[in-house]
Amino acid sequence: QKKSQDLESVQEVGGSYWQRVTLILELLQHKKKLKSPQILVPTLFNLLSRCLEPLPQEQGNMEYTKQLILSCLLNICQKLSPDGGKIPKDVLDEEKFNVELIVQCVRLSEMAQTHHHALLLLGTVAGIFPDKVLHNIMSIFTFMGANVMRLDDTYSFQVINKTVKMVIPALIQSDSGDSIEVSRNVEEIVVKIISVFVDALPHVPEHRRLPILVQLVDTLGAEKFLWVLLILLFEQYVTKTVLAAAYGEKDAILEADTEFWFSVCCEFSVQHQIQSLMNILQYLLKLPEEKEETISKAVSNKSESQEEMLQIFNVETHTSKQLRHFKFLSVSFMSQLLSSNNFLKKVVESGGPEILKGLEERLLETVLGYINAVAQSMERNADKLTVKFWRALLSKAYDLLDKVNALLPTETFIPVIRGLVGNRLPSVRRKALDLLNNKLQQNISWKKTIVTRFLKLVPDLLAIVQRKKKEGEEEQAINRQTALYTLKLLCKNFGAENPDPFVPVLSTAVKLIAPERKEEKNVLGSALLCVAEVTSTLQALAVPQLPSLMPSLLTTMKNTSELVSSEVYLLSALAALQKVVETLPHFISPYLEGILSQVIHLEKITSEVGSASSQANIRLTSLKKTLATTLAPRVLLPAIRKTYKQIEKNWKNHMGPFMSILQEHIGVMKKEELTSHQSQLTAFFLEALDFRAQHSENDLEEVGRTENCIIDCLVAMVVKLSEVTFRPLFFKLFDWAKTEDAPKDRLLTFYNLADCIAEKLKGLFTLFAGHLVKPFADTLNQVNISKTDEAFFDSENDPEKCCLLLQFILNCLYKIFLFDTQHFISKERAEALMMPLVDQLENRLGGEEKFQERVTKQLIPCIAQFSVAMADDSLWKPLNYQILLKTRDASPKVRFAALITVLALAEKLKENYIVLLPESIPFLAELMEDECEEVEHQCQKTIQQLETVLGEPLRSYF
């Protein structure tokens, strides 16, 4: 009390009074036992207030006095509240404690020592009268940012720490969570405080930067405010650092800054870091897409999310470019942080990824939500210049997702994915499935426990496939498709060892492809691929599904317009069918006719619309091969016979694919199988070979192409037969063609077949060809219009058919002569064939063009080869003479043809022709003066060529 009166009695004038005050204050400072020291408080503030008023020069420096007053106030506070808590009102009234004066002390004084005293006092008062300090908090920190933080001495550093430690908890405690307004208010003040620190950072001595920021965030609470610091650091880089950086230095500066940011983050726990990343992502989501939006929002009282949003990065005060740079930098930093050594080391030190349980799922979810938002922005800006930025940002966001994914051990990954697969956002579910698919495609040997966990996902995936969520149609289709793909991968990886969980998968996929479901095409395609995989894995376990699967699959394949319009769908259907046939060949006989019909029909269609090298055609070829090579003849042949009856009704372009299956099947039949099924096959071929006769009025070329498919197939069987087994077949076919009441068209078929067999059997065919000599000779005469006027075929296209018949006979004879090594052409056979063949030189059947073509391509090579096969000069002479006689024909075309035949004969017989030369010269001499210039010219050429062939000059004979 006495002291209080002493202090008050000091007069305002004169330096001696201040000296007394100083003395008393010094005494007070050392006085340990003071009763009711609170009585001094108003007096001390009164003195402090006087100290701050401008004083006459002679009063000297009052800084020491200020420091003493502040020190006394600090002592009183510490005495009244040893624990730093609030003081009851009846002890010391808040109103008497003038915080504003202390703040003024800080601001007006130029002396660091005074600042320190004032700040220490404020720190203590913050605990006792928090509200009083809060009103002045920004002044305190602004001052610190501008002054104290720039000093590089330990004492200043301690003052900063002390102030932060004392003032900020008071601020945080004032947010008791009573009202949103108070909380928001406190948050905004905190943002401003952090902002002061970040702004001061470039001026803070480098080695002090990290400790100051760490102390600040530690005191504020890293879980709540680390993210705010990071955002302000990014903002500082985007708005200030980049502008200040010299050209070419930006990368180095960014690298250094990023390293510093890593250091800041890694001072805090992994959990707090991950929480901060989530907060940053959520904050980025609230930012507008573009700067322009905020202008309109400002006019319309801002949108709700803007309103609720904590103002850290003020969009209105930044450019669009800065906003974009800020977003990109934020995502880029997060991605780098998660793969940085500092962070990974921290994870290991904290006890490995297990400590993240629960957090990483939320982080994944947040990242996926962010990716979804960026993807939508990219779509919205597809036609704007900024699309490049959105694409880059999306790529960075996916990069971030990969980093999050890489952090998860598989044990944690599976439950996290399981949680995300059930997420309410379709896009999150889809991305979760993608992550799972990526994991399943890694070539890893999984532990049994992990496989079990993977298999537990099957019911969750089936729920998506069965559309047990009420979401948008399109969204669901893509998710269901992805889930089917995931099931396929699971089955591929684990199904062989663990088939049971996949039985319901097959059953679900089979239900999806039922025609009455009318499923979306892409879902159907994925379901079919899933069927393919699961069937081949389950094998016998898939058999119970066949009665449901096969009819649906065959109905799907009947819908050719749908299939052809989508190659993926078509390939999926073929894959499913291929796997069923490969895996369960013994169980598909009830469906074999349907399978054959559909495969044949599809090949016809795909070959019409696409190239032979298309994926669909390759897949079809493979499927036909599987059908032909895996099924037993007892199963396949009856189905072939029944299917043929269907094919024949609609034969155009179907016969080739159909016969190719049988041809390949015959190719792989064992000898004993062929023997036991030969009669069945013979009966089938006799029926099939009647094709031409049954379609005698159709286009000859088309019929010919189709018949060749049947013949190729039959020849495939013939080459596998022995002479003993082929002979009866040959006679059967011969009788089939030659019986009295047989249609003439059968001869076309038979001679075509004989030609093809002659080509395949080569010299062996001469064992059977003897029976053909007379029929060939007779037919050659019957279709020679220089000998008969009668039509051979009773149809409008008789000449075309006769030309074709001639072609087959001449080709077949040529091959018999060419491959003959057994002296097949005896004198009798030579005589039987000689005139019918030579007379063909006069047969102008089919018109001039056809005649010339036939003579050049078939007749002349055949006669020339005939002469070689005779190998007898006694037979050459009559042959040569008969040909020479034709050079006297009334028609110049015939004379011309005969002349070329003479030359062909000479070219084949070479020096042996010399014996025939004397006989030939008179005929050639006549032709040298032929009335037809063309013939005369050809004769001269022929003589020249004969000279070359025989190696003798012939000019002297003419």
Curated annotation (Swiss-Prot):
Gene Ontology, cellular component aspect: 90S preribosome; nucleolus; small-subunit processome; t-UTP complex
Disulfide connectivity? none
| Database matches in InterPro entries | ARM-like, ARM-type_fold, BP28_C_dom, HEAT_Utp10/HEAT1, UTP10
> In which domain of life is the source organism classified?
Eukaryota
Q: Pfam families attached here?
A: BP28CT, HEAT_HEATR1
Q: Where are the HEAT repeats?
A: 920-956
- Any idea where this protein resides? Nucleus, Nucleolus
Checking SMART domains in the record gives: BP28CT
- GO molecular function list: snoRNA binding
Query: What GO terms in the biological process aspect are recorded for it?
Result: maturation of SSU-rRNA from tricistronic rRNA transcript (SSU-rRNA, 5.8S rRNA, LSU-rRNA); neural precursor cell proliferation; positive regulation of transcription by RNA polymerase I; protein localization to nucleolus; ribosomal small subunit biogenesis; rRNA metabolic process
The alphabetical list of record keywords is: Nucleus, Phosphoprotein, Ribonucleoprotein, Ribosome biogenesis, rRNA processing, Transcription, Transcription regulation
Name the protein family.
Belongs to the HEATR1/UTP10 family.
Function recorded in the entry: Ribosome biogenesis factor; required for recruitment of Myc to nucleoli. Involved in nucleolar processing of pre-18S ribosomal RNA. Required for optimal pre-ribosomal RNA transcription by RNA polymerase I. Part of the small subunit (SSU) processome, first precursor of the small eukaryotic ribosomal subunit.
- What is said about its interaction partners and assembly? Part of the small subunit (SSU) processome, composed of more than 70 proteins and the RNA chaperone small nucleolar RNA (snoRNA) U3. Interacts with MYC; the interaction is required for localization of MYC to the nucleolus.
Q: What is this protein called?
A: HEAT repeat-containing protein 1
Phylogenetic lineage: Eukaryota, Metazoa, Chordata, Craniata, Vertebrata
